[in-house]
Protein backbone atom coordinates (compact mmCIF):
# COMPACT_ATOMS: atom_id res chain seq x y z
CA UNK A 1 0.00 0.00 0.00
CA UNK A 2 2.05 2.94 -1.27
CA UNK A 3 1.64 6.38 0.24
CA UNK A 4 1.52 5.40 3.89
CA UNK A 5 4.20 6.65 6.22
CA UNK A 6 5.28 5.32 9.56
CA UNK A 7 4.63 7.57 12.55
CA UNK A 8 7.50 9.81 13.57
CA UNK A 9 9.34 9.44 16.86
CA UNK A 10 7.69 12.67 18.03
CA UNK A 11 4.21 11.29 17.25
CA UNK A 12 4.93 8.07 19.13
CA UNK A 13 6.32 9.94 22.16
CA UNK A 14 3.31 12.23 22.15
CA UNK A 15 1.00 9.22 22.08
CA UNK A 16 2.95 7.60 24.93
CA UNK A 17 2.63 10.77 27.04
CA UNK A 18 -1.12 10.86 26.38
CA UNK A 19 -1.42 7.26 27.60
CA UNK A 20 0.52 8.09 30.78
CA UNK A 21 -1.51 11.26 31.38
CA UNK A 22 -4.83 9.46 30.95
CA UNK A 23 -3.76 6.45 33.01
CA UNK A 24 -2.91 8.83 35.86
CA UNK A 25 -6.48 10.17 35.76
CA UNK A 26 -7.92 6.97 37.23
CA UNK A 27 -9.09 7.39 40.82
CA UNK A 28 -8.75 3.70 41.58
CA UNK A 29 -5.16 2.75 42.46
CA UNK A 30 -5.36 -0.73 40.92
CA UNK A 31 -6.71 0.51 37.58
CA UNK A 32 -4.22 3.39 37.50
CA UNK A 33 -1.22 1.17 38.18
CA UNK A 34 -2.43 -1.48 35.74
CA UNK A 35 -2.76 0.99 32.86
CA UNK A 36 0.56 2.67 33.65
CA UNK A 37 2.29 -0.71 33.69
CA UNK A 38 0.54 -1.91 30.54
CA UNK A 39 1.44 1.30 28.71
CA UNK A 40 5.12 1.08 29.63
CA UNK A 41 5.33 -2.61 28.79
CA UNK A 42 3.58 -2.27 25.43
CA UNK A 43 5.62 0.70 24.26
CA UNK A 44 8.91 -0.88 25.39
CA UNK A 45 8.03 -4.15 23.67
CA UNK A 46 7.59 -2.38 20.33
CA UNK A 47 10.32 0.22 20.75
CA UNK A 48 12.73 -1.43 18.30
CA UNK A 49 10.17 -2.19 15.60
CA UNK A 50 11.44 -1.03 12.19
CA UNK A 51 8.85 -2.25 9.69
CA UNK A 52 6.78 0.79 8.55
CA UNK A 53 3.63 -1.29 7.97
CA UNK A 54 3.81 -2.82 11.43
CA UNK A 55 4.56 0.58 12.98
CA UNK A 56 1.56 2.13 11.25
CA UNK A 57 -0.73 -0.68 12.42
CA UNK A 58 0.59 -0.42 15.99
CA UNK A 59 0.11 3.35 15.92
CA UNK A 60 -3.48 3.09 14.67
CA UNK A 61 -4.30 0.43 17.25
CA UNK A 62 -2.74 2.53 20.01
CA UNK A 63 -4.77 5.59 18.98
CA UNK A 64 -7.95 3.51 19.20
CA UNK A 65 -6.90 2.17 22.60
CA UNK A 66 -6.17 5.72 23.77
CA UNK A 67 -9.74 6.70 22.94
CA UNK A 68 -11.03 3.86 25.10
CA UNK A 69 -8.63 4.78 27.92
CA UNK A 70 -9.76 8.42 27.82
CA UNK A 71 -13.42 7.46 28.06
CA UNK A 72 -12.78 5.03 30.90
CA UNK A 73 -10.69 7.54 32.85
CA UNK A 74 -13.55 10.06 32.64
CA UNK A 75 -16.00 7.43 33.87
CA UNK A 76 -13.57 6.53 36.67
CA UNK A 77 -13.56 10.14 37.85
CA UNK A 78 -17.33 10.01 38.35
CA UNK A 79 -16.98 7.46 41.15
CA UNK A 80 -14.98 7.61 44.35
CA UNK A 81 -13.19 4.75 46.00
CA UNK A 82 -11.70 4.40 49.45
CA UNK A 83 -7.96 4.82 49.46
CA UNK A 84 -5.96 1.62 49.72
CA UNK A 85 -3.24 1.03 52.29
CA UNK A 86 -0.57 1.30 49.57
CA UNK A 87 -1.72 4.78 48.54
CA UNK A 88 -0.43 7.93 50.22
CA UNK A 89 -3.13 9.77 52.18
CA UNK A 90 -2.18 13.25 50.98
CA UNK A 91 -2.63 13.09 47.22
CA UNK A 92 -0.83 10.92 44.72
CA UNK A 93 2.84 10.92 43.89
CA UNK A 94 3.52 10.36 40.20
Swiss-Prot record:
Top-level taxon of the source organism: Eukaryota
Primary site of residence: mitochondrion
Signal sequence range: none
Mitochondrion in keyword set: yes
A Pfam family per the record: Complex1_LYR
GO biological process, any: iron-sulfur cluster assembly
GO cellular component: iron-sulfur cluster assembly complex; L-cysteine desulfurase complex; mitochondrial matrix; mitochondrion
Keyword flag Mitochondrion: yes
Compartments reported by the entry: Mitochondrion
Keyword vocabulary terms for this entry: Mitochondrion
InterPro entries, sorted: Complex1_LYR_dom, Complex1_LYR_LYRM4, ISC_assembly_LYR
Purpose: Required for mitochondrial iron-sulfur proteins biosynthesis.
Quaternary structure, from the entry: Interacts with NFS1.
Misc remark: Present with 2440 molecules/cell in log phase SD medium.
Family: Belongs to the complex I LYR family.
Name under which the protein is recorded: Protein ISD11
Species in which this protein is naturally found: Saccharomyces cerevisiae (strain ATCC 204508 / S288c) (Baker's yeast)
Taxonomic lineage: Eukaryota, Fungi, Dikarya, Ascomycota, Saccharomycotina
Encoding gene (name): ISD11
Amino acid sequence: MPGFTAPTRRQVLSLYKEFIKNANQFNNYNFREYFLSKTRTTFRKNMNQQDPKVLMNLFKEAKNDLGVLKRQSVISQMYTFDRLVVEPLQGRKH
